[in-house]
């Protein structure tokens, strides 16, 4: 069996950019076919030519489906053309298995989401650019509050039935909140008891199980616990992950389950746990319900964050050899980082000022009054203090150096950050949260002028001036500053040399 796996793997690698067999072809050959297959980056069957995902644009609410090119990689250029001059959200992630197990905006459950009627947020269509074999594609960047779900899935494991699953994730994008998951969950979006889930979890939560080091870890969300092994506590064999692209795999059958993982860009999978179910009531036998979740917990806990590129769920318990062949296929796809910024270039270390382009406000610049970030009328004849308040030093992004952070010229060590969706000026406290809140990515101005500046950690949200105060705003949403009227103008700023 292992020799066959090596043959399959070699074929995948030799095929280069046009992979002969996709992950689901490999699972099928191993006798554990995919019953759900989701990816915004590529086809997961060699013969799949249908839609990968759907995007909806903010300008007119129109939608379009993004399909793979002949290489199997998503047609990112079609998305870029459709979304030009506006914003786009990922509304559907299509199931490639033929079972119709598509993922859509998650409804409320035990926890409500931040959108109208308690629904979760949808992901930005541009928050997670990557390349596969040099071809651009977009992943699914899940900010807290974002989630997708299908509570009426077909063919997924129920009860104690055997299943497997894997996901390719961003190993650098995570948090300790509950719960960035992909996999099998409750059908009513509520916690129905121990053993009613079986999903991949990625993050550094320490509320339930843990692995070695400080995390993040690949664990299993089995409901009412994140498990790293048979104990509800620590499994020293479950390592902290530091790969940019990570393959995470979970599989389970009666009184047997496993955690496997590895670098999605090179090398093989390792087994972090393989053995009996947790020695806690409710997990042997399992009571899986068969819904599918992405980015959230089974009860719609939506505080987690992470990035998803591809993943599947299978019928039956895949062999290690089959999973090893799938890993070789993933490595052959050659995931790599892509630029997070576009439009007018910024130079780290330079001083800049940012002028509004909305017709009302073209003499106003982004400035601060104490900790409040606002717009003020500034000119070359303004007082020195005001010119300093309206000048910002460009720094490499504190959370991601492919983007930027903006340090105050007159308050050294203080940066623009978002807090409760408002922009404020705070001293850098060195925390992971501060770094993420203070990291922003530039793109060509949505209204055609200058630059628009989106939050790295909430890429649906942009610097916006609203009643002269600065927010991170989405193009339509539940907050007054998310209003669609004048959005494109309000989020576009002309960058110039700093006043000071």
UniProtKB/Swiss-Prot annotation:
It catalyses: Hydrolysis of terminal non-reducing alpha-L-arabinofuranoside residues in alpha-L-arabinosides; Hydrolysis of (1->4)-beta-D-xylans, to remove successive D-xylose residues from the non-reducing termini. Its EC number is 3.2.1.55, 3.2.1.37. The gene is xyl1. Residues 1-21 form the signal peptide. Glycans are attached at residue 467. Belongs to the glycosyl hydrolase 54 family. Pfam families: AbfB, ArabFuran-catal. Keywords: Carbohydrate metabolism, Glycoprotein, Glycosidase, Hydrolase, Multifunctional enzyme, Polysaccharide degradation, Signal, Xylan degradation. The keyword Hydrolase applies. One of its GO terms (biological process) is L-arabinose metabolic process. The keyword Kinase does not apply. The lineage of its organism: Eukaryota, Fungi, Dikarya, Ascomycota, Pezizomycotina. It comes from Trichoderma koningii. It comes from the Eukaryota. This is Arabinofuranosidase/B-xylosidase. GO terms for molecular function: alpha-L-arabinofuranosidase activity; xylan 1,4-beta-xylosidase activity. InterPro entries: A-L-arabinofuranosidase_B_cat, ABFB, AbfB_ABD, AbfB_ABD_sf, ConA-like_dom_sf.
């Amino acid at each position: 069996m292992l020799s066959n796996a090596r043959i399959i793997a070699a074929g995948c690698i030799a095929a280069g950019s046009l992979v002969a067999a996709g992950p689901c072809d490999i699972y099928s050959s191993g006798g554990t076919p995919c019953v759900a297959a989701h990816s915004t980056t590529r086809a997961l069957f060699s013969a799949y030519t249908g839609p990968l995902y759907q995007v909806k644009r903010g300008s007119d609410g129109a939608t379009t489906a993004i399909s793979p090119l002949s290489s199997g990689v998503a047609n990112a250029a079609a998305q870029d053309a459709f979304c030009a001059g506006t914003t786009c959200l990922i509304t559907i992630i299509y199931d490639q298995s033929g079972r119709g197990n598509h993922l859509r905006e998650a409804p409320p459950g035990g926890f409500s989401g931040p959108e109208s009627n308690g629904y979760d947020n949808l992901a930005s269509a541009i928050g997670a650019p990557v390349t596969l074999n040099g071809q651009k594609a977009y992943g699914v960047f899940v900010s807290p509050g974002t989630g997708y779900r299908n509570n009426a899935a077909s063919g997924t494991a129920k009860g104690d039935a055997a299943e497997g699953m894997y996901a390719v994730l961003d190993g650098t994008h995570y948090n300790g909140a509950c719960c960035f998951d992909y996999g099998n969950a409750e059908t009513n979006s509520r916690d129905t008891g121990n053993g009613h889930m079986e999903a991949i979890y990625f993050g550094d939560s320490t509320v339930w199980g843990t692995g070695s080091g400080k995390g993040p870890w690949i664990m299993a969300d089995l409901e009412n616990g994140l498990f790293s092994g048979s104990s509800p506590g620590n499994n020293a064999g479950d390592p902290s992950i530091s790969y940019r692209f990570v393959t995470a795999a979970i599989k389970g059958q009666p009184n047997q389950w496993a955690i496997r993982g590895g670098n999605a860009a090179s090398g093989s999978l390792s087994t972090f746990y393989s053995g009996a179910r947790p020695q806690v009531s409710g997990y042997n036998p399992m009571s899986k319900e068969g819904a599918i979740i992405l980015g959230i917990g089974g009860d719609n806990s939506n505080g987690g964050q992470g990035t998803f590129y591809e993943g599947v769920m299978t019928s039956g318990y895949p062999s290690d050899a089959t999973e090893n062949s799938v890993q070789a296929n993933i490595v052959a796809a050659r995931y790599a980082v892509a630029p997070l910024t576009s439009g007018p270039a910024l130079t780290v270390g330079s001083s800049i000022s940012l002028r509004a382009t909305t017709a009302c406000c073209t003499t106003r610049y982004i400035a601060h009054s104490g900790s409040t970030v606002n717009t003020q009328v500034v000119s070359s004849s303004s007082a020195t203090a005001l010119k300093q308040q309206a000048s910002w030093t460009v720094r490499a992004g504190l959370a991601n150096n492919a983007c930027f952070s903006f340090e105050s010229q007159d308050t050294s060590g203080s940066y623009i950050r978002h807090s409760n969706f408002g922009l404020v000026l705070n001293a850098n406290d060195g925390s992971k949260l501060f770094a993420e809140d203070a990291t922003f990515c530039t793109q060509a101005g949505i209204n055609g002028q200058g630059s628009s500046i989106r939050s790295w950690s909430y890429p649906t949200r942009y610097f916006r001036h609203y009643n002269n105060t600065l927010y991170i705003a989405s193009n339509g949403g539940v907050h007054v500053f998310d209003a669609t009227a004048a959005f494109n103008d309000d989020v576009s700023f002309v960058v110039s040399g700093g006043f000071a």
